[in-house]
Every structure is written in C-alpha cells, then in structure tokens.
A protein has these predicted regions:
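Condensing-enzyme catalytic core mediating Claisen C-C bond formation in acyl metabolism
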Residues: 2-82, 182-249, 256, 260, ...
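Short beta-strand segments
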Residues: 13-16, 112, 142, 168-174, ...
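Conserved beta-ketoacyl condensing-enzyme motif
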Residues: 55-132, 138, 143, 269-285
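Short, well-ordered amphipathic alpha-helical segments that serve as non-catalytic structural scaffolds
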Residues: 61, 83-99, 155, 200, ...
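A contiguous, well-structured pocket-lining segment that forms one wall/lid of small-molecule binding clefts
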Residues: 79, 90, 95-97, 231-306
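Claisen-condensing/thiolase-fold acyl-transfer catalytic domains that form or cleave C-C bonds
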Residues: 89, 114-115, 121, 125-128, ...
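Active-site-adjacent elements of ketosynthase-type condensing enzymes
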Residues: 118-124, 170-191, 219-236, 282-290, ...
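Active-site glycine-rich loop that binds ribose-phosphate moieties when present
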Residues: 134, 141, 151-155, 175-199
C-alpha cells in the first residue's frame, strides 16, 4: 500500500493589527477643511467628496495639531523611524503568537511601507531587536503603495512554494499622516487629507500547518498607461501624493483581471465564499460588487476597515482579513479571493481556501 505523499501548502494566518491612539473624526476633518480653506473655490466639492468616503474615524501617530505642522522632510522621516521602531515589534509578536511560531521559525521577512524611508530596512533592525535568525531573508517593498499588502501576500506565497515548509512574516507599516502637505490644496489633495489613516499590520504565512487561507494561486495585473494616475511627486518637502480623478473608476478594467485569475483556477469570481480586498474608497467596493456581480455584503470586512480606520494603505487587506477571523472565519475549504490595488495602476491578486488548524497531508 502506497503512503499518501505529503503536500505542503502555504497558509496565511490571522493578522495582528494596531492603530495609533490619536483619533480624528469625519466631523473634525470637515471642520478643519472649512477653517483652513474657507476661500477655496472648490471647497463645497471637496467637503462632499470627503463625506462620501464614509470614513468616520482615522487614527494618526501624532496629535492633529502636530500633524498639521510641517517641520521638514528630515524631521518627519525621523518620526517615521522612531514610531515604527516603537510600534512594530508588539504587532509582530502577536502575529507570531497567533501563528504559533517563534522568531527562529521565520525564514523571510517581507516589509512593506510607502510613507517613510529607511536604509537598512526595518527588517534588519527587527532581526537584531527581536532575535530572528541571522540567516533570515529580507524583502523590503517600498514603491507599490496600497497594492503592497497584496504583493506581500503573493511574494510570501511564492517563497513558501519555492522553499517547502518555510515560514514568511509580512509586516505593513503605514503612517500616511506624515505625508500631509499643507501647501497642496487641489481637490484631490483635500480628499486625500480626509481619507488616509495610519496603521500597522503583520501576518505569518506558514509553509505547513496553521489556520487561515491556504493560498493556491496568485497573479498581478497592470492597467496599461496609468502609471501617472497614482504617484508621489518627491520634493524637498517630502512625498506629495497625486491622485488622478479617474482612479475611482479603475475597477471596471480590473474586475476582468480578477475574473480571469479565478477562471484559470477553474473558479467563478462571482461565486466565492469570501472576498478580502483593498478598500481605497467606497466606489471601489461598490464597483467591484457591480462588475463581479457579488452581493455588497461580501465586502463588509473591507468596508468596515475603511469606515473605522480610513485607507491605511498596504495594511488594509490585512485588517480586512483580521475582521474575517474575528467573525469566526469561514467554513473549512471555503473558497475566497484577496486583492490589493495601487499605483501602476496595479492589482495584486490571490486565490485560496479556508483551512482549519490541521496538518496538511
């Protein structure tokens, strides 16, 4: 009698998420816009767009009075570094605990962030500070913006498939409030000022065992000739975020990419059990529901993140997944889709099945 050959599938485990203690409400955001831009000819439009985001609260690393100041790019980046070092380790530790692993079990750290810069990457500091093994690989990703959460999941999946039984740690650290530019007063900038928040998330992809999403396939898609639709203009004052007015409509060309990926796997993107996607704004979720022909309730986790935290960039997809875990997870072998959207315009997509915490054999 032949023994069943062991199969090792990468499993995305429960994410750990933390947001800073300073909170700003939509009402406070609207009042700030009115008081600081009272003479702006398009203020009514900006206020309406901010209200339409549905973002009720956002969390930021500094009190709003400090956030509104601009001490210079150098000082802001120092704040990014100090806040990341103060806040990331506890989030990482919770993710490791949830995955029932130690730092010495991790083979690669994938660190994503687009709101500050460090060299060496925070990965090097984490390896030293938290006693990861010195042979731990480092993959910092700095220029995929909001798509980086999905990209990190996909690169972790790739790594665990290339090295069976390996374990990957994903860390997303985004302090969007440190990118506030008081001189940027275009409608797109005013909208961004009411949309983005700060947050940190971490999750482990286990090469063997664990409860969560057993990753089966991933893919990427870039909408041609849209690289200027979401971008940074890097100046002496730091990162100036540019958002084209055509961005909210990008789900119409991206939905077919999601359908194609599912089709390659023999699945129907309109008939899955759970959806974990980046919520850049409410229209993204509304249009995904429309073009994928999926009940809006399917995107409740992503919408809750947007409502309670705002757009926390690469950390959104991990927080949405955390909410699925908090709801009790999905049925064993339930099928689902994960996706991050960001500059490029890029979609990073993954398909997987829910699995309980049993050894895959």
């Amino acid at each position: 009698m032949r023994r069943k050959q062991a199969r090792f599938m990468a499993t995305l485990c429960r994410p750990s998420v933390s947001v800073p203690e300073h909170v700003i409400t939509m009402e406070e955001t609207l009042e700030l816009a009115r008081s600081r831009h009272a003479d702006h000819p398009q203020l009514p439009l900006a206020l309406r767009l901010i209200e339409n985001t549905g973002v009720k609260t956002r969390h930021i690393v500094q009190p709003i009075e400090e956030t509104l100041k601009h001490p210079g790019f150098e000082e802001r980046n120092k704040i990014y570094v100090s806040e990341a070092k103060a806040r990331v380790p506890s989030v990482v530790q919770r993710a490791l605990d949830d995955a029932e692993l130690l730092t010495t079990d991790i083979d690669v750290i994938i660190y994503v962030s687009c709101t500050g810069f460090m060299m060496p990457s925070l990965t090097a500091w984490l390896i030293n500070e938290m006693s990861f093994d010195a042979t731990t690989r480092q993959i910092p990703i700095a220029q995929l913006g909001c798509a980086a959460g999905g990209a990190a999941i996909n690169r972790a999946h790739d790594f665990c498939m290339a090295y069976p039984k390996a374990n990957a740690l994903i860390v997303a650290c985004e302090f969007c409030s440190l990118c506030y530019q008081p001189t940027d007063i275009g409608v797109g900038s005013l909208l961004s000022n009411g949309l983005f928040g700060d947050g940190i998330a971490a999750a482990v992809v286990r090469g063997r065992g664990g409860e969560g999403i057993e990753l089966e396939r991933n893919g990427s898609y870039l909408i041609p000739k849209t690289e200027e639709w979401i971008m940074y203009d890097v100046r002496a004052t730091g990162f100036h975020f540019l958002l084209d007015k055509r961005v909210p409509a990008t789900m119409e060309p991206l939905a077919p990419a999601l359908q194609d990926l599912a089709g390659l796997h023999g699945w129907d993107a309109a008939d899955l059990d759970f959806y974990i996607v980046h919520a850049g704004g409410p229209r993204i979720l509304d249009d995904l529901s429309k073009f994928l022909q999926v009940d809006p309730h399917a995107f409740r986790f992503s919408r809750a993140t947007l409502t309670e935290y705002g757009n926390i960039a690469s950390a959104v997809v991990l927080d949405a997944l955390r909410r699925l875990f908090d709801e009790g997870g999905a049925q064993d072998r339930a099928r689902g889709l994960l996706a991050g959207f960001g500059p490029g315009i890029t979609a990073e997509m993954a398909l997987g099945r829910w699995r309980t915490d049993e050894e895959a054999v």
